[in-house]
Swiss-Prot record:
Source lineage: Bacteria, Pseudomonadati, Pseudomonadota, Betaproteobacteria, Burkholderiales
Listed GO CC annotations: cytoplasm
Main location: cytoplasm
Keywords: Chaperone, Cytoplasm, Nickel insertion
Record protein name field: Urease accessory protein UreD
Protein backbone atom coordinates (compact mmCIF):
# COMPACT_ATOMS: atom_id res chain seq x y z
CA UNK A 1 0.00 0.00 0.00
CA UNK A 2 1.32 3.44 -0.92
CA UNK A 3 0.57 6.79 0.66
CA UNK A 4 -0.08 9.96 -1.30
CA UNK A 5 -0.51 13.01 0.88
CA UNK A 6 -0.66 16.77 0.46
CA UNK A 7 -0.37 19.64 2.89
CA UNK A 8 -0.84 23.36 2.22
CA UNK A 9 0.01 25.86 4.95
CA UNK A 10 -0.64 29.57 4.48
CA UNK A 11 0.71 32.29 6.76
CA UNK A 12 -1.02 35.67 6.74
CA UNK A 13 -0.44 38.83 8.71
CA UNK A 14 -3.51 40.00 10.63
CA UNK A 15 -2.81 43.25 12.48
CA UNK A 16 0.31 42.40 14.52
CA UNK A 17 -0.16 38.63 14.41
CA UNK A 18 0.96 35.93 11.96
CA UNK A 19 -1.86 33.41 11.55
CA UNK A 20 -1.59 29.94 9.99
CA UNK A 21 -4.29 28.16 8.00
CA UNK A 22 -3.79 24.70 6.52
CA UNK A 23 -5.45 22.12 4.29
CA UNK A 24 -4.46 18.50 3.92
CA UNK A 25 -5.28 15.18 2.37
CA UNK A 26 -3.79 11.89 3.48
CA UNK A 27 -1.49 11.40 6.46
CA UNK A 28 0.00 14.88 6.88
CA UNK A 29 -0.95 17.22 9.69
CA UNK A 30 0.04 20.50 11.32
CA UNK A 31 0.11 20.68 15.09
CA UNK A 32 -1.22 23.63 17.06
CA UNK A 33 0.30 27.01 16.19
CA UNK A 34 2.68 28.26 18.86
CA UNK A 35 3.93 31.78 19.59
CA UNK A 36 6.98 31.46 21.87
CA UNK A 37 8.36 34.74 20.47
CA UNK A 38 5.14 36.72 20.53
CA UNK A 39 2.35 37.15 18.00
CA UNK A 40 4.56 38.19 15.10
CA UNK A 41 6.22 34.79 14.52
CA UNK A 42 4.15 31.61 14.20
CA UNK A 43 5.82 28.24 14.89
CA UNK A 44 4.37 25.05 13.38
CA UNK A 45 5.31 21.36 13.40
CA UNK A 46 4.55 19.02 10.48
CA UNK A 47 3.48 15.52 11.50
CA UNK A 48 3.55 12.49 9.18
CA UNK A 49 2.05 9.61 11.21
CA UNK A 50 3.33 6.76 8.97
CA UNK A 51 6.84 7.88 9.93
CA UNK A 52 8.52 7.32 6.57
CA UNK A 53 8.21 6.78 2.83
CA UNK A 54 8.47 3.57 0.81
CA UNK A 55 8.46 3.05 -2.94
CA UNK A 56 5.43 4.69 -4.55
CA UNK A 57 4.76 7.15 -1.72
CA UNK A 58 4.46 10.84 -2.59
CA UNK A 59 4.31 13.76 -0.18
CA UNK A 60 3.51 17.22 -1.56
CA UNK A 61 3.99 20.17 0.79
CA UNK A 62 3.27 23.80 -0.08
CA UNK A 63 3.91 26.69 2.29
CA UNK A 64 3.13 30.32 1.58
CA UNK A 65 3.78 33.47 3.58
CA UNK A 66 1.81 36.60 2.83
CA UNK A 67 3.19 40.12 3.00
CA UNK A 68 4.61 40.85 6.45
CA UNK A 69 4.03 37.33 7.80
CA UNK A 70 6.75 35.30 9.54
CA UNK A 71 6.42 31.53 9.89
CA UNK A 72 8.76 28.87 11.26
CA UNK A 73 8.21 25.25 10.21
CA UNK A 74 9.94 22.16 11.58
CA UNK A 75 9.33 18.45 12.15
CA UNK A 76 9.31 16.23 15.25
CA UNK A 77 11.58 13.60 13.73
CA UNK A 78 13.51 12.49 10.69
CA UNK A 79 12.01 11.89 7.26
CA UNK A 80 12.81 8.24 6.54
CA UNK A 81 13.17 6.84 3.04
CA UNK A 82 12.85 3.07 3.38
CA UNK A 83 13.75 0.25 1.00
CA UNK A 84 11.86 0.23 -2.30
CA UNK A 85 10.89 -2.77 -4.40
CA UNK A 86 11.06 -0.75 -7.61
CA UNK A 87 9.06 2.47 -7.46
CA UNK A 88 10.66 5.67 -6.16
CA UNK A 89 9.51 7.61 -3.10
CA UNK A 90 9.13 11.35 -3.59
CA UNK A 91 8.83 14.34 -1.29
CA UNK A 92 8.18 17.72 -2.92
CA UNK A 93 8.23 20.96 -0.94
CA UNK A 94 7.43 24.40 -2.31
CA UNK A 95 8.01 27.59 -0.32
CA UNK A 96 6.42 30.79 -1.68
CA UNK A 97 6.92 34.17 -0.01
CA UNK A 98 5.26 37.46 -0.85
CA UNK A 99 6.98 40.84 -0.50
CA UNK A 100 8.23 41.48 3.02
CA UNK A 101 7.52 37.96 4.27
CA UNK A 102 9.93 35.82 6.26
CA UNK A 103 10.05 32.06 6.62
CA UNK A 104 12.24 29.54 8.42
CA UNK A 105 12.26 26.02 6.97
CA UNK A 106 13.97 23.82 9.58
CA UNK A 107 13.01 20.15 9.18
CA UNK A 108 15.02 17.45 10.89
CA UNK A 109 17.15 15.20 8.73
CA UNK A 110 16.17 12.85 5.91
CA UNK A 111 17.54 9.32 6.38
CA UNK A 112 18.23 7.12 3.36
CA UNK A 113 17.96 3.47 4.32
CA UNK A 114 19.74 0.86 2.25
CA UNK A 115 17.67 -0.05 -0.79
CA UNK A 116 15.74 3.20 -0.98
CA UNK A 117 14.95 4.86 -4.30
CA UNK A 118 14.18 8.38 -3.17
CA UNK A 119 13.93 11.97 -4.33
CA UNK A 120 13.67 15.05 -2.14
CA UNK A 121 12.80 18.29 -3.97
CA UNK A 122 12.73 21.80 -2.52
CA UNK A 123 11.64 24.82 -4.56
CA UNK A 124 11.69 28.37 -3.19
CA UNK A 125 10.01 31.38 -4.80
CA UNK A 126 10.47 34.76 -3.14
CA UNK A 127 9.07 38.16 -4.07
CA UNK A 128 11.22 41.25 -3.72
CA UNK A 129 11.90 42.00 -0.06
CA UNK A 130 11.08 38.48 1.14
CA UNK A 131 13.73 36.49 3.03
CA UNK A 132 14.10 32.86 4.06
CA UNK A 133 16.46 30.80 6.20
CA UNK A 134 16.30 27.08 5.52
CA UNK A 135 18.35 23.95 5.75
CA UNK A 136 18.63 20.50 4.25
CA UNK A 137 20.22 17.54 6.05
CA UNK A 138 20.60 14.05 4.58
CA UNK A 139 22.01 10.94 6.26
CA UNK A 140 23.06 7.88 4.28
CA UNK A 141 22.31 4.84 6.40
CA UNK A 142 22.68 4.68 10.17
CA UNK A 143 26.41 4.16 10.80
CA UNK A 144 26.06 4.21 14.58
CA UNK A 145 23.63 1.29 14.33
CA UNK A 146 25.80 -0.59 11.81
CA UNK A 147 23.18 -0.07 9.09
CA UNK A 148 25.13 1.18 6.06
CA UNK A 149 23.68 2.68 2.89
CA UNK A 150 24.74 -0.33 0.82
CA UNK A 151 22.51 -0.06 -2.24
CA UNK A 152 19.86 2.22 -3.69
CA UNK A 153 20.03 5.89 -4.64
CA UNK A 154 18.90 9.32 -3.50
CA UNK A 155 18.20 12.36 -5.71
CA UNK A 156 18.31 15.83 -4.21
CA UNK A 157 16.95 18.94 -5.90
CA UNK A 158 17.15 22.42 -4.31
CA UNK A 159 16.08 25.34 -6.47
CA UNK A 160 15.25 29.01 -6.47
CA UNK A 161 14.13 29.36 -10.11
CA UNK A 162 16.34 31.62 -12.16
CA UNK A 163 18.70 32.19 -9.24
CA UNK A 164 20.11 29.00 -7.74
CA UNK A 165 19.97 25.29 -8.52
CA UNK A 166 21.63 22.32 -6.86
CA UNK A 167 20.92 18.80 -8.02
CA UNK A 168 22.67 15.58 -7.07
CA UNK A 169 22.17 11.86 -7.52
CA UNK A 170 23.82 9.84 -4.76
CA UNK A 171 24.11 6.14 -5.63
CA UNK A 172 25.24 3.79 -2.88
CA UNK A 173 27.34 1.79 -5.34
CA UNK A 174 29.26 4.83 -6.60
CA UNK A 175 32.39 4.38 -4.50
CA UNK A 176 34.13 7.35 -6.11
CA UNK A 177 31.30 9.63 -5.04
CA UNK A 178 30.73 8.03 -1.64
CA UNK A 179 34.31 7.57 -0.46
CA UNK A 180 36.82 9.64 -2.42
CA UNK A 181 37.98 13.17 -1.50
CA UNK A 182 36.22 14.33 -4.68
CA UNK A 183 32.86 13.29 -3.21
CA UNK A 184 31.64 12.60 0.31
CA UNK A 185 35.09 11.42 1.45
CA UNK A 186 33.62 8.59 3.49
CA UNK A 187 31.28 10.92 5.39
CA UNK A 188 27.68 9.78 5.67
CA UNK A 189 25.87 13.04 6.35
CA UNK A 190 25.71 16.01 4.00
CA UNK A 191 24.01 19.20 5.10
CA UNK A 192 23.52 22.80 4.08
CA UNK A 193 21.92 25.91 5.53
CA UNK A 194 21.00 28.79 3.26
CA UNK A 195 19.79 32.35 3.44
CA UNK A 196 17.89 33.38 0.32
CA UNK A 197 16.38 36.76 -0.52
CA UNK A 198 13.86 37.86 -3.11
CA UNK A 199 16.15 40.67 -4.24
CA UNK A 200 19.89 41.30 -4.33
CA UNK A 201 21.52 41.58 -0.95
CA UNK A 202 23.63 44.65 -0.29
CA UNK A 203 27.29 43.75 -0.71
CA UNK A 204 28.18 44.59 2.91
CA UNK A 205 25.22 42.63 4.28
CA UNK A 206 26.12 39.58 2.21
CA UNK A 207 29.79 39.74 3.19
CA UNK A 208 28.89 40.08 6.85
CA UNK A 209 26.69 36.98 6.56
CA UNK A 210 29.66 35.05 5.15
CA UNK A 211 31.96 36.38 7.86
CA UNK A 212 29.51 35.46 10.62
CA UNK A 213 29.10 31.94 9.24
CA UNK A 214 32.85 31.44 8.82
CA UNK A 215 33.45 32.55 12.39
CA UNK A 216 30.99 29.90 13.60
CA UNK A 217 32.59 27.26 11.36
CA UNK A 218 36.11 28.05 12.54
CA UNK A 219 35.10 27.42 16.16
CA UNK A 220 33.41 24.09 15.35
CA UNK A 221 34.91 20.60 15.24
CA UNK A 222 33.75 20.19 11.62
CA UNK A 223 35.69 23.20 10.34
CA UNK A 224 37.80 21.01 8.03
CA UNK A 225 34.71 19.77 6.13
CA UNK A 226 32.54 22.90 6.19
CA UNK A 227 32.52 26.11 4.21
CA UNK A 228 30.47 29.21 3.44
CA UNK A 229 29.90 30.66 -0.01
CA UNK A 230 27.59 32.97 -1.96
CA UNK A 231 26.74 31.44 -5.35
CA UNK A 232 24.49 34.40 -6.22
CA UNK A 233 23.82 37.88 -4.92
CA UNK A 234 20.56 36.60 -3.41
CA UNK A 235 21.96 33.47 -1.75
CA UNK A 236 24.40 32.64 1.06
CA UNK A 237 25.09 28.95 1.78
CA UNK A 238 26.98 26.93 4.35
CA UNK A 239 27.74 23.32 3.41
CA UNK A 240 29.14 20.62 5.68
CA UNK A 241 30.04 16.93 5.58
CA UNK A 242 30.00 14.88 8.78
CA UNK A 243 30.21 11.24 9.85
CA UNK A 244 26.88 11.51 11.69
CA UNK A 245 23.87 13.84 11.75
CA UNK A 246 24.34 15.25 15.24
CA UNK A 247 27.54 17.27 14.75
CA UNK A 248 26.28 18.62 11.41
CA UNK A 249 22.98 19.65 12.96
CA UNK A 250 24.80 21.37 15.82
CA UNK A 251 26.76 23.47 13.34
CA UNK A 252 23.65 24.35 11.34
CA UNK A 253 21.80 25.46 14.44
CA UNK A 254 24.69 27.71 15.44
CA UNK A 255 24.76 29.32 11.99
CA UNK A 256 20.97 29.69 12.07
CA UNK A 257 21.17 31.48 15.41
CA UNK A 258 23.92 33.77 14.14
CA UNK A 259 22.13 34.60 10.88
CA UNK A 260 18.82 35.20 12.65
CA UNK A 261 20.53 37.78 14.79
CA UNK A 262 22.52 39.27 11.91
CA UNK A 263 19.78 39.49 9.29
CA UNK A 264 16.68 40.00 11.40
CA UNK A 265 17.92 41.16 14.80
CA UNK A 266 15.97 38.26 16.31
CA UNK A 267 17.33 36.09 19.13
CA UNK A 268 17.01 32.40 18.36
CA UNK A 269 14.02 30.68 19.97
CA UNK A 270 14.52 26.94 19.60
CA UNK A 271 11.31 25.14 18.58
CA UNK A 272 9.99 23.34 21.65
CA UNK A 273 9.67 20.05 19.77
CA UNK A 274 13.48 19.84 19.50
CA UNK A 275 13.81 19.42 23.26
CA UNK A 276 11.31 16.57 23.51
Amino acid sequence: MTWNATLALDYTRQAEKTVAHFRHSGPLRILQSLYPEGDGICHNVIVHPPGGLVGGDTLDLAFTAGAGAHGLVTTPGATRFYRSTGEPALQRTRLSLEAGARMEWLPLEAICYSGCLAENRLTMELASGAELIGWDVTAFGLPAASLPFAHGHFCQHIEMPGVWLERARIAAGDTLLMDSPLGLAGQRCMASIFFVAGSKLERNRRQQALDVAREVIEAHALRATAGATSPDGQVVVVRVLAPLVEPAMTLLRQVWQAWRSHFWQQPAALPRIWSM
